[in-house]
């Protein structure tokens, strides 16, 4: 068997997320069906992360096995051809060792969350960022973010449907940068809880709106209660950027 590692980008707006689900179209299903059309083989695609409906990806990584060798550049061309008309594409493909696993071999995952912060919405960024019309206090958000860095119990920021056995995670990066009318939040960790990034963003926005004091983020973290945290930020602003191995 030959194991292939592919890197994928997609717009999640019209998709039900990464994972295959009955009755709806997912990224996994689109790619598995595309691979079958040119290889004749039924494959199972394993992704490095399971993005939700509406979430985008710039560098999602996945792997699959084929019984015959095909040149990686031809695989890219074939997948992109058969994945049409969906906004899903592969931009890298390479052979990987048989013990490589897109999910379990990962050492870190990186996300970006985009906020358009101006009085009027952006047509260009419709469904690709969270539009917030009121000015956000970015320095306050940056100060609050410091409380979340490191190893903590992130129960307050996990979805009620989260199936992770442990709520202990290590947030290695949480940088907030304002560029003109856009605010970007950069987050990285070995792994994340379900909705963890979006719940963190939703809470930091409350700080940015001066609804919460900076120190309240620390109180929310220590509460270990989802009800203590802010709302879940919209999926449209979230991008799965890359996975490190």
Swiss-Prot record:
Per the UniProt entry, what are the Gene Ontology biological process annotations, in alphabetical order?
tRNA pseudouridine synthesis
Pfam families named in the record: PseudoU_synth_1
Residue numbers annotated as active site: 52 (nucleophile)
Entries under SUPFAM superfamilies matching the protein: Pseudouridine synthase
**E.C. designation(s):** 5.4.99.12
Provide the family line.
Answer: Belongs to the tRNA pseudouridine synthase TruA family.
Function of the protein: Formation of pseudouridine at positions 38, 39 and 40 in the anticodon stem and loop of transfer RNAs.
The record, for NCBIfam families, names: hisT_truA
Quote the subunit structure annotation. Answer: Homodimer.
Q: What name has this protein been given in UniProt?
A: tRNA pseudouridine synthase A
Q: Which organism is it from?
A: Rickettsia africae (strain ESF-5)
Name of encoding gene: truA
């Amino acid at each position: 068997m030959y194991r292939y590692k592919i890197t994928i980008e997609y717009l999640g707006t019209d998709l039900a997320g990464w994972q295959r689900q009955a009755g709806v179209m997912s990224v996994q299903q689109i790619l598995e069906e595309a691979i079958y059309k040119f290889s004749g083989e039924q494959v199972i695609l394993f992704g490095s992360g399971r993005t939700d409906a509406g979430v985008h990806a710039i560098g999602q990584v996945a792997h699959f096995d084929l019984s015959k060798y095909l040149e990686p550049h031809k695989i890219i061309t074939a997948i992109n051809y058969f994945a049409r008309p969906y906004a899903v594409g592969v931009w890298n493909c390479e052979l990987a060792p048989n013990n490589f696993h897109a999910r379990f071999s990962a050492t870190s995952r990186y996300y970006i969350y985009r906020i358009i912060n101006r009085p009027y919405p952006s047509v260009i960024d419709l469904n690709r960022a969270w539009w917030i019309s009121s000015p956000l206090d970015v320095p306050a958000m940056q100060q609050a973010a410091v409380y979340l860095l490191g190893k903590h119990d992130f129960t307050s920021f996990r979805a009620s449907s989260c199936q992770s056995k442990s709520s202990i995670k290590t947030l290695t990066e949480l940088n907030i940068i304002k560029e003109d009318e856009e605010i970007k939040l950069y987050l990285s960790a070995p792994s994340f809880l379900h909705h963890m990034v979006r719940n963190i963003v939703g809470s930091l926005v409350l700080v940015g709106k001066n609804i919460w004091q900076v120190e309240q983020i620390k109180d929310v973290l220590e509460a270990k209660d989802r009800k203590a945290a802010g709302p879940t930020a919209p999926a449209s602003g979230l991008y799965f950027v890359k996975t490190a191995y």
